[in-house]
Structure formats: C-alpha cells, structure tokens
C-alpha cells in the first residue's frame, strides 16, 4: 500500500529558551527533525511532507531536499490543524503522522505500526508509562477496544490514572483523513484542533483501532527543554555504544563516547575514553584510538593508531600508520602505510608516503612527501605568500634537518638532505645537501650587556 508521511515541525519550543527553532536543536550532531526525516526515508514513502511554522525559513533552509515537501502552518492551532495544511498534497492509501521533536523513533517500530493499517483499520503507537503526566490517555472499553484519546489537560481524575499514553504517532487510511479533519472542533481547554479526536470519529464510523508499542519507551520521548534534549542525547549514545560493542569494538567506557554522524567499524577496534566521531568515519580492523580524540570525516585503515588528544578532519591513515599524541590532521592529510606523525605536528592537504616520519613540532601544508622521508623537528612548509598557496614536493628518502623552513614552491629530489636551521628557497637536486643559513661566527671576549642603574 502506498504511503505519505506527515512530520509536524511547526512548534516554537518556548521552554528551550532559544532563538533556534525547537526541531533544529541537535541530537548526536543532527537536528531532531533531521533524525525523523532520515527514519521516514527508510520507509520509502511516496511523499514526505514537513509542516513548518515557527522559524519556517530556517527549517526549510537546513533540511532542503528534493524529496521533502514543506507546508506552512501560519497559525499554530493544534495538531489536527497542522495535518490539515498538508491535505492537498496527500494521495496515498496510508498516511503516517510523525513529530519533528521525537528523534529516536525506529523504522522497525513504524513498520510494525503500518502493517496494521487498512481501509477500515487505524493504528496508534502507544506506550505504557509509570508516570504518564502530559500524555493523552488511551481510553478503552470493557473489551479492551480503544474508544478515545483524552488529552491530559482535559482528562478526568479516573482517566489520568490510566498508564497507557498516546505518543501522537498514528497511521490512518488516507481516504478517511480529509473527512475526519474537516469535522474537528476546538471546543477544549486549549482551544485547539486535536488530531487525537479523529480516534473517536473512527470508532463512531465503525473502524477498528489497532495499537502497537515501541521496544523502548525512549523511542517516543520528545524534547521540550534542554534537560530532555540532553536525556535524548545520552540515550542515543548508549544505543550506539551497544551496537558498536556488538560489532566487535572495545569501548573503554561506553558512557564517555559520542558519535555525531555515522561510522563503519571493523573488528577488534579499541576506542578509549572521551572520543568523538563526527560526520562519516571509517574504522578498519585493529585500529586503536586513544583518549580525548576528535575524528571527523576520516578513514583509518587496518591497524592504524590515533594517540591521545589528536584531532583529525578529512584525513586518512594508511595501514599501520600512527599519529599523535597531540597531532592535528586537517582536510587532505593522508598518511601512507606505516607513516608516522608525532606530537604537535599539523598537516593540511599533505601526503606522507609509506614509512615517512614527522616526529614533532612541524607544520606541513600543501605538501607531497615521499616514502621513508624524515622530517626533523620544527620543520615548516612556507606555503602562503599572503595571496596564494604553493606546494612543496619531496622525493623518497629525503632527510629534512631540524628547524628547516621550506619556502614553496620548492622541490627536493630523492635522497636530498637539508641542514638544520636552513631556509630552502630553491629546488634541491636528488642526493644533494642543501644549506641555507649564515655561517657561524664565534666572537672572543664578548661582554654581555648589563642593566643600567636607574
């Protein structure tokens, strides 16, 4: 059966106390709405319709995509009114209603819900809670059939004692929706058009009301304030940690690991505490990541090591390569197999060949460095003249003396050597020693200056 999905994302979120629309607040590096959209796509609907209101343009700009239809709710008059704004775009046999501030809902849960929907059958996602305060209550008759949903503010004391709550997520037969929405009334405490009122209409029309529940109640937890947002974050990270450990990853402390994007992992990977992965990260078998590292949009090949306090973005470490501690690899940094980058070394758009080494205190930008080349401490590639960037090229087996400055554009042939403290401004032929510094002079009888008396 065909499917349209409507995502309600028009709320202001006043309790967030933020200029940012509520649905754009992040969980694990993605907006809450972004998570919901990603889950919706897994269901392969014919259309995804996002109802926006507060901060509409910011939401539209952030989530803009060819497969999303944005619908404006100019006035926030309730959930029923919000869905009604999308009606002209709905044509599928089933319509699924989701919420932009409920980011942890799982696609498998929604598939089970949708499996229960038919022309004469509507499906609700409900949840059993110890404290259902704030949730609409699922009212059933003596036979256990759902007959209505009563919002918390409108519920009687007896109804508030019900522990089965309405998550707001429901799937309905598309052919019935327009009629039900057209009959909604705002005669309630809030003065709003409640989507939940369609349940009583469906019962009156003789439809069966099916229910489904999530595996985990946190799937349907929304975020109305910063505390709830933090709770969603920690639950998401806990879920990710369990999945990674099941795939053969050792997390020294699962509570001190954050994924803010997506990761592919091999087996026997070790990740120490306070590691953050962002964007798309690929980690192959046997990789070790030390504590306090941030790795973004990078690939770590088999057996690579990232030592403590290193920051990688847009980088690649070859098999058996290592970097750190305190290394910074910026976009375009590539370490060949068994290459080594040590402490306080920064690479940007630089390639180190197999077995090349830059042990400490260096900046290597816009550089191509051949296999087995050794970069001495304090080496700088001077790649910027104030207007343009230039490349430095070193062949295989080059030896760069400590505290050398290589003024690009410059090329050093295979086996070339620079003396410590040299400023290299011209190409160095293969096998040559280049010295670019003043000759040392020793001055006998030198008297150090003394402080003048005041």
UniProtKB/Swiss-Prot annotation:
Active site: 360 (proton acceptor)
Cofactor comment text: Binds 1 Mg(2+) ion per subunit.
EC number: 2.7.7.23, 2.3.1.157
Binding residue positions for UDP-N-acetyl-alpha-D-glucosamine: 8-11, 22, 73, 78-79, 99-101, 136, 151, 166, 224, 330, 348, 363, 374
Residues that bind Mg(2+): 101, 224
Protein family according to the UniProt entry: In the N-terminal section; belongs to the N-acetylglucosamine-1-phosphate uridyltransferase family. In the C-terminal section; belongs to the transferase hexapeptide repeat family.
Protein name listed in UniProt: Bifunctional protein GlmU
């Amino acid at each position: 059966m065909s499917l349209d999905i409507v995502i309600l994302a028009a709320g202001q979120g006043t309790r967030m106390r933020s200029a940012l629309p509520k649905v754009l607040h992040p969980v694990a590096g993605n907006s809450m709405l972004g998570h919901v959209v990603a889950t919706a796509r897994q269901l392969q609907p014919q259309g995804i319709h996002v109802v926006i209101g507060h901060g509409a343009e910011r939401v539209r700009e952030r989530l803009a995509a060819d497969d999303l239809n944005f619908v404006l709710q100019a006035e926030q008059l309730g959930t029923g009114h919000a869905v009604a704004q999308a009606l002209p775009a709905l044509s599928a046999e089933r319509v699924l209603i989701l919420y932009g501030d409920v980011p942890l809902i799982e696609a498998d849960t929604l598939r089970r819900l949708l499996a229960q929907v038919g022309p004469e059958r509507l499906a609700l996602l409900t949840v059993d809670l110890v404290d259902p305060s704030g949730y609409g209550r699922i009212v059933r008759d003596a036979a256990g059939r759902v007959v209505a949903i009563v919002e918390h503010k409108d519920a009687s004391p007896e109804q508030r004692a019900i522990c089965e709550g309405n998550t707001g997520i429901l799937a309905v037969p598309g052919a019935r929706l327009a009629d039900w929405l057209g009959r909604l009334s705002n005669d309630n405490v809030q003065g709003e058009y409640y989507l939940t009122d369609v349940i009583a209409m469906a019962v009156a029309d003789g439809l069966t009301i099916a229910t489904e529940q999530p595996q985990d109640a946190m799937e349907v937890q929304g975020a109305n304030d910063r505390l709830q947002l933090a709770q969603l974050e920690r639950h998401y990270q806990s879920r990710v940690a369990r999945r990674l450990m099941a795939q053969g990853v050792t997390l020294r402390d699962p509570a001190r690991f954050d994924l803010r994007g997506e990761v592919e992992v091999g087996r026997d990977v070790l990740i120490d505490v306070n590691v953050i992965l962002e964007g798309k990260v690929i980690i192959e078998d046997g990789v070790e990541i030390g504590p306090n590292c941030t790795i973004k949009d990078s690939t770590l090949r088999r057996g690579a090591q990232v030592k403590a306090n290193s920051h990688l973005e847009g980088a690649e470490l070859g098999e058996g390569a290592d970097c750190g501690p305190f290394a910074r690899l910026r976009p375009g940094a590539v370490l060949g197999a068994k290459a080594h980058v040590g402490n306080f070394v920064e690479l940007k758009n630089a390639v180190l060949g197999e077995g090349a080494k830059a042990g400490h205190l260096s900046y290597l930008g816009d550089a191509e460095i051949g296999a087995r080349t050794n970069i001495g401490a304090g080496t700088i590639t001077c790649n910027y003249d104030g207007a343009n960037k230039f490349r430095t090229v070193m062949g295989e087996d080059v030896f760069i003396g400590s505290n050398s400055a290589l003024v690009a554009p410059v090329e050093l042939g295979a086996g070339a050597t620079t003396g410590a403290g040299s400023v290299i401004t011209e190409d160095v032929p293969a096998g040559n020693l280049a010295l670019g510094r003043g000759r040392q002079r020793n001055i006998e009888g030198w008297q150090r200056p003394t402080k003048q008396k005041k």
